[in-house]
């Protein structure tokens, strides 16, 4: 049974107004694209320049999807001069939003070919909106298609509040405006990144160059933007991502290479353990940089898969760094496991444990919470046969904090026995913005990594006020 201290009970008895006042010092996040008031600590993650793929143009336009928004872009458009090979990974939530249903069907119909753009609105998820919601998603695509002189060539994404219909007339009337604003500059890409944001405090945009073994003299480009700060947990979370490349990736190779990358990036992060209705990560390749077409089973395929996985990991980590109420970026690494599946499940369980996350926020070296999460991560559900969890052997288990400044790890548990923890050293490590929790299972040679953040008072404030 959980007990409460007298202090805690007195706080629970406080009038609502007093409780609100006690958190009044916490800066609130506006539910819309980030403004000029980007936190100083986050500005370092916003690029000041970039190198963008040939043939793609983008824009961000103010529509006012939420009536309260009159100043920030909330409609994003990406187009390609030529048809693209395309693939997407979608949420596994059973209540899939209308744009997810629409876009999945489109890619199946087109065989991952002939896609020429993506249209995205923020401010309304168009989720759990019935037949009318599907019609609205189709209207968004048709409006963009009309601007391009195409048909069935546009992927649709939406993000925002669930259960509300889109102001569809307002959106489709502004799609031509979004089309006329298209451009390929860094500022255009950054504006698009801002347009897909909701509770994000900064736009998330990355661009890189790379080469492939068969065309060492050709410089390829890849660029992508993503959004997400809450309701983040595989598979996937309120997370939208658009990645574009001018490399010639075949339509048959694109789905597998994207799934491989997403499993090791966007599906390896968690903010709060909630999986959204709208998650979509789409990859478009128009081949305009030239070179040999990339197909499965070739050195080019392996090389591009590595490039995309690293690129996707960088994008996914930006989401964690902008987690709602987050003050820390935490890497959870589980090694020496009997299986990769077990390592992933353990890392995921630790990463989403509220007790672990609040201890990290409080700078409390409470390794018992880490061990507790490890211990229950693989146990059977009550209705299932008992699993003795051979992947976890208590006397083989080790837990450490690993500083990111290159200094020695702080051992907390060694072979199932607690260490005499240097609390002063632990406090120094927990004071850092970045830290790693390392769990060695001692039962094999497999491993997995997750990225998460802490929980602060601000997380409650943001989500308590989400619809207001």
UniProtKB/Swiss-Prot annotation:
Give the location in the cell.
Mitochondrion matrix
This entry's Enzyme Commission designation comes to 2.3.1.35, 2.3.1.1
Site label Cleavage, positions: 237-238
User: Which residue positions hold the site described Involved in the stabilization of negative charge on the oxyanion by the formation of the oxyanion hole?
Assistant: 159-160
Q: Which residues form a coiled coil?
A: none
A Gene Ontology molecular function term of the record: L-glutamate N-acetyltransferase activity
Metabolic or biological pathway, per its Swiss-Prot or TrEMBL entry: Amino-acid biosynthesis; L-arginine biosynthesis; L-ornithine and N-acetyl-L-glutamate from L-glutamate and N(2)-acetyl-L-ornithine (cyclic): step 1/1; Amino-acid biosynthesis; L-arginine biosynthesis; N(2)-acetyl-L-ornithine from L-glutamate: step 1/4
* GO-annotated cellular components: mitochondrial matrix
* Xref: InterPro entries: Arg_biosynth_ArgJ, ArgJ-like_dom_sf, ArgJ_beta_C
Keyword Metal-binding attributed: no
Q: Which UniProt keywords apply?
A: Acyltransferase, Amino-acid biosynthesis, Arginine biosynthesis, Autocatalytic cleavage, Mitochondrion, Multifunctional enzyme, Transferase, Transit peptide
Name which cysteines form disulfide bonds: none
Where along the chain is the active site annotated? 238 (nucleophile)
Q: Which reaction does it catalyse?
A: N(2)-acetyl-L-ornithine + L-glutamate = N-acetyl-L-glutamate + L-ornithine; L-glutamate + acetyl-CoA = N-acetyl-L-glutamate + CoA + H(+)
Among its keywords, does the record have Transit peptide?
yes
Q: Enumerate the residues binding substrate.
A: 198, 227, 238, 324, 463, 468
Q: How is it modified after translation?
A: The alpha and beta chains are autoproteolytically processed from a single precursor protein within the mitochondrion.
* Record: transit peptide: 1-23
Task of the protein:
Catalyzes two activities which are involved in the cyclic version of arginine biosynthesis: the synthesis of acetylglutamate from glutamate and acetyl-CoA, and of ornithine by transacetylation between acetylornithine and glutamate.
Q: Which HAMAP family match?
A: ArgJ (MF_01106)
Tell me the subunit arrangement.
Heterodimer of an alpha and a beta chain.
* NCBIfam families from the UniProt entry: ArgJ, PRK05388.1
Similarity comment: Belongs to the ArgJ family.
Name-wise, this protein is: Arginine biosynthesis bifunctional protein ArgJ, mitochondrial
The record lists the organism as: Podospora anserina (strain S / ATCC MYA-4624 / DSM 980 / FGSC 10383) (Pleurage anserina)
């Amino acid at each position: 049974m959980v007990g409460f201290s007298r202090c805690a009970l007195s706080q629970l008895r406080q009038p609502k107004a007093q409780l609100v006042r006690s958190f009044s010092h916490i800066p609130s996040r506006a539910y819309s694209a980030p403004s000029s008031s980007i936190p100083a600590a986050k500005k370092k993650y916003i690029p000041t320049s970039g190198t963008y793929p040939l043939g793609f143009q983008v824009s961000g336009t103010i529509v006012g999807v939420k009536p309260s928004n009159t100043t920030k872009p909330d409609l994003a458009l990406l187009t390609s001069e030529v048809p693209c090979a395309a693939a997407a990974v979608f949420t596994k939530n059973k209540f899939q939003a209308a744009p997810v249903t629409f876009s999945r069907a489109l890619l199946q119909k087109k065989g991952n070919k002939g896609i020429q753009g993506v249209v995205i609105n923020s401010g309304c998820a168009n989720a759990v909106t019935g037949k009318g919601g599907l019609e609205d998603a189709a209207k968004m695509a048709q409006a963009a298609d009309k601007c391009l002189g195409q048909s069935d060539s546009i992927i649709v994404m939406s993000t925002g509040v669930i259960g509300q219909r889109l102001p569809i007339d307002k959106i489709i009337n502004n799609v031509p405006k979004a089309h006329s604003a298209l451009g390929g500059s860094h500022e255009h890409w950054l504006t698009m990144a801002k347009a897909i944001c909701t509770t994000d405090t900064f736009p998330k945009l990355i661009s890189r160059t790379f080469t492939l073994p068969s065309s060492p003299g050709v410089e390829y480009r890849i660029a992508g933007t993503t959004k997400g700060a809450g309701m983040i947990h595989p598979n996937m979370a309120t997370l939208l991502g658009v990645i574009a490349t001018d490399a010639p990736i075949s339509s048959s190779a694109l789905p597998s290479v994207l799934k491989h990358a997403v499993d090791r990036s966007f599906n390896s992060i968690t903010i709060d353990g909630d999986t959204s209705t709208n998650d979509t990560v789409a990859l478009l390749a128009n081949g305009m940089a030239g070179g040999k077409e990339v197909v499965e089973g070739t050195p080019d395929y392996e090389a591009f898969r590595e490039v995309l996985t690293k690129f996707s990991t960088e994008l996914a980590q930006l989401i964690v760094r902008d987690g709602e109420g987050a003050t820390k970026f935490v890497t959870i690494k589980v090694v020496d496991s009997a299986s990769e599946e077990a390592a992933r499940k353990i890392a995921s369980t630790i990463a989403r444990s509220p007790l672990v996350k609040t201890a990290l926020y409080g700078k409390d070296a409470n390794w018992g919470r880490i061990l507790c999460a490890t211990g229950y991560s693989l146990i059977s559900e009550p209705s299932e046969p008992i699993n003795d969890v051979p992947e976890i052997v208590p006397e083989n288990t080790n837990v450490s904090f690993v500083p990111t400044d290159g200094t020695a790890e702080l051992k907390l548990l060694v072979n199932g026995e607690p260490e005499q923890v240097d609390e002063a050293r632990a406090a120094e490590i927990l004071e850092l913005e970045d830290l790693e929790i390392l769990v060695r299972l001692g039962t094999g040679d497999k491993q997995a990594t997750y990225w998460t953040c802490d929980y602060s008072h601000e997380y409650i404030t943001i989500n308590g006020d989400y619809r207001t």
